[in-house]
């Protein structure tokens, strides 16, 4: 199968990011042209190290650029309590000499976009700081972005504060800018990602699959979004799944705003499902997932990996 969708992946590895990167690399429908890192689950130095370790593990020559170390206006609040202090606890990766590109992520994204023969798809599975910086410094790049597919937000409850999902809550100002940008946005938030559970039976079969299955199984043993006994949630993998199998998702066009001021609600995505605010839709919001179909696709895409 010839890869038909050219993508750039912005990520903050992160254990479930490792699964998403595997899918982005090995799904035959996708052509991953650049990886960029951002501070989120852990510091940007750690997310960059983790991404480089994964690329070395897979012997991949995909270029990688390090991105923002802090949110636009706030100090970083990370998720080491979910992913471990390193961000990818549980597997001993071998040493390597790989380094990121010399230029920052938002410039690397700009360069790839402006040199592409046609608009490309951005996939953001961490805080939206790098995407906001791109739009702030190079607004002309928007014409070269086919769409932005993101993992973030929620139409209901949060997983970082009572109402806010982690990726949006880490940098709500960046998220607000992105949702106001006019980009075509597909939002895969907690409404679907909490459904994207890999069962214990599925997880127990991973080590026999290949080297990648063994590595991911080791990481998932240390992942605190679920457990090996009850199943683990593949939040970030949903964004990649939508690219390849959009029919697995139920989407609705909605107006989405990001709260930046509230004492208790900063980082909340206000998803106007019923159109009560009278604002035009600015996102396609995923609200339901075919879980069995998702698990089948995950098994297929992991089998493509070495």
UniProtKB/Swiss-Prot annotation:
<dbReference type="InterPro" id="IPR022976">
    <property type="entry name" value="Nucleosid_hydro_RihC_nonspecif"/>
</dbReference>
<dbReference type="GO" id="GO:0005829">
    <property type="term" value="C:cytosol"/>
</dbReference>
<dbReference type="InterPro" id="IPR001910">
    <property type="entry name" value="Inosine/uridine_hydrolase_dom"/>
</dbReference>
<dbReference type="Pfam" id="PF01156">
    <property type="entry name" value="IU_nuc_hydro"/>
</dbReference>
<dbReference type="InterPro" id="IPR036452">
    <property type="entry name" value="Ribo_hydro-like"/>
</dbReference>
<dbReference type="GO" id="GO:0006152">
    <property type="term" value="P:purine nucleoside catabolic process"/>
</dbReference>
<protein>
    <recommendedName>
        <fullName>Non-specific ribonucleoside hydrolase RihC</fullName>
        <ecNumber>3.2.-.-</ecNumber>
    </recommendedName>
</protein>
<keyword id="KW-0378">Hydrolase</keyword>
<dbReference type="GO" id="GO:0008477">
    <property type="term" value="F:purine nucleosidase activity"/>
</dbReference>
<dbReference type="InterPro" id="IPR023186">
    <property type="entry name" value="IUNH"/>
</dbReference>
<dbReference type="GO" id="GO:0006144">
    <property type="term" value="P:purine nucleobase metabolic process"/>
</dbReference>
<keyword id="KW-0326">Glycosidase</keyword>
<dbReference type="GO" id="GO:0006206">
    <property type="term" value="P:pyrimidine nucleobase metabolic process"/>
</dbReference>
<comment type="similarity">
    <text>Belongs to the IUNH family. RihC subfamily.</text>
</comment>
<comment type="function">
    <text>Hydrolyzes both purine and pyrimidine ribonucleosides with a broad-substrate specificity.</text>
</comment>
<feature type="active site">
    <location>
        <position position="235"/>
    </location>
</feature>
């Amino acid at each position: 199968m010839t890869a038909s969708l050219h993508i750039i992946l912005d990520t903050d590895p992160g254990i479930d990011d490792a699964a998403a990167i595997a899918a982005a690399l090995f799904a035959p429908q996708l052509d991953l042209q650049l990886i960029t890192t951002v501070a989120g689950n852990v510091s940007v130095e750690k997310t960059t190290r983790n991404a480089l370790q994964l690329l070395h593990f897979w012997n991949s020559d995909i270029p990688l650029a390090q991105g923002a170390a802090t949110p636009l206006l706030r100090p970083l609040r990370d998720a080491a309590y979910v992913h471990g202090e390193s961000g990818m606890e549980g597997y001993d990766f071998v040493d390597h000499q790989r380094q990121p590109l010399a230029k920052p992520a938002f410039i690397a994204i700009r360069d790839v976009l402006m040199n592409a023969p046609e608009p490309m798809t951005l996939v953001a599975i961490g805080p939206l700081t790098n995407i906001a910086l791109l739009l702030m410094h190079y607004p002309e790049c928007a014409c070269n972005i086919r769409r932005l597919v993101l993992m973030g937000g929620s139409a209901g409850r949060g997983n970082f504060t009572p109402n806010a999902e982690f990726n949006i809550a880490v940098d709500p100002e960046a998220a607000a800018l992105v949702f106001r940008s006019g980009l075509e946005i597909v939002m895969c938030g907690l409404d679907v990602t909490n459904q994207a559970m890999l069962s214990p039976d599925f997880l127990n079969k991973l080590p026999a699959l290949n080297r990648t299955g063994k590595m991911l199984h080791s990481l998932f043993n240390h992942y605190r979004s679920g457990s090996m006994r009850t199943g683990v949630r593949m939040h970030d993998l949903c964004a990649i799944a939508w690219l390849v199998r959009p029919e697995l998702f139920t989407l609705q066009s909605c107006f989405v705003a990001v709260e930046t001021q509230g004492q208790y609600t900063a980082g909340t995505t206000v998803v106007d499902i019923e159109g009560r605010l009278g604002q035009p839709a600015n996102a396609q919001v995923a609200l339901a997932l075919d879980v069995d179909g998702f698990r089948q696709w995950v098994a297929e895409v992991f089998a493509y990996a070495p």
